[in-house]
Amino acid sequence: MTSATTVKTEYEAIIGLETHCQLSTNTKIFSSSSTAFGADPNTNIDPVCMGLPGVLPVLNEKVLEYAVKAGLALNCQIAKYSKFDRKQYFYPDLPKNYQISQYDLPIAEHGWLEIELLDAEGNPKRKRIGITRLHMEEDAGKLVHAGSDRISGSTYSLVDYNRAGVPLVEIVSEPDIRTGQEAAEYAQELRRVMRYLGVSDGNMQEGSLRCDVNISVRPVGQEKFGTKVEIKNMNSFSAIQKAIEHEIERQIEAIESGEKIIQETRLWEEGSQRTISMRTKEGSSDYRYFPEPDLAPIEVSEAQLSQWRGELPELPAQKRHRYESELGLSAYDTRVLTEDVTVSQYFEAAIASGANPKAAANWITQDIAAYLNKQKLSIAEIGLTPANLADVITRIETGKISNAQAKQKLPELLTGLSPEKAFAGQELISDLSVLEPIVDEVIAANPKELEKYRNGNINLKGFFVGQVLKKTNKRADPKLTNELVEKKLNG
């Protein structure tokens, strides 16, 4: 591939994402079968999702609620009148030979999502990505190919219809994205929003969040878009970024060598780190959409819309802005704290229990985060409650214990030991009448070091401080010890 650094200034990429989010309802969109992941193949099925004769779909009201809340969170206009349509196509994973989706009257459209990237200095760069539309639809089944990850090259294929009829919202962005990094951040922010709302778990490994990328390149300054290529089969955020970066280079190289870019669907191959051609891209006319005759149109009342709007939580971007402006936290800390709703809830509970916000942020984003990563735990699984973290921070700030003592006891605190028991009998010695004789004793016991210090080796002050801490089992107040040692050495 041509090095991207020699051509990025001459070309720009035009990128949009189509994201399917599986909604966290207990039952399917048009029937009562379970949506539970991991069930034995073809056990969560029923006559409706299998398209058997004589049955009719009935809309799951929770799907409409979740779709509207997602649309509101993405700053969309909610349609007062909407409907479902049949999308016709033939594939083994589609038992009815059509999918119930929405075409010309989606439930939500014309919104935006703010993304935030940090520069090398940690300063946030924010950008709004337009949302073209959000619509409801049912998922298809899942093909399992023996001997390959797709039909080509497999010895046989099996179909699991458990996923057929699982509710989805498809969110289509405007072509406002320019880089793979922006695309990956957009997808991550979208997942954060869905998780904060509680409408989707966004687990990519379970297929709850699936992204397709539409990408073209054009010379900088040209208004007309280039030929669009769709990329599928990206199963992680890093794969989204890498697939886009590869495809940008591929298209630029093709243009500069005189090749014509064709409108097609390509697959991202994780193993070879490249995209390969899958099929020519279909247009909407290929699907022969028409209104779904078995479902009534949808009307959302002002009262219902107002109720759902009032139930929206504070969203990730709103929290980041508040943490920075009101609590004085860095952009990096706010990103870590808002990445997962349970982390932000823990942080806010610690503050409510009296913790200094900056100190709480430091403990959560550094020491506690390192423990969680090492143990592969979530913050909800640790034994250190927010109230106990606040207790530890208060003990440090009031001089009862040192930061070093707290870090030494952290592993036990994280497994449930209370601060009272952890620091029993370990309060810092800050009484001059107790500390001064210990300092005098240490200085008297090290005459050679004292002579070297007074001859100009002032770095030896740390030696004397260390000896005092050692003698007191690290219970000597560090600040007071430093002041007292310096006074005695220079006396």
UniProtKB/Swiss-Prot annotation:
It is an enzyme of class 6 (ligase). Its EC number is 6.3.5.-. The keyword Nucleotide-binding applies. GO terms for biological process: glutaminyl-tRNAGln biosynthesis via transamidation; translation. SMART domains: GatB_Yqey. It comes from the Bacteria. InterPro entries: Asn/Gln-tRNA_amidoTrfase_suB/E (IPR017959), Asn/Gln-tRNA_Trfase_suB/E_cat (IPR006075), Asn/Gln_amidotransferase (IPR018027), Asn/Gln_tRNA_amidoTrase-B-like (IPR003789), GatB (IPR004413), GatB_C_1 (IPR042114), GatB_Yqey_C_2 (IPR023168), Gln-tRNA_amidoTrfase_suB_CS (IPR017958). Disulfide bonds: none annotated. Belongs to the GatB/GatE family. GatB subfamily. This is Aspartyl/glutamyl-tRNA(Asn/Gln) amidotransferase subunit B. It comes from Trichormus variabilis (strain ATCC 29413 / PCC 7937). The gene is gatB.
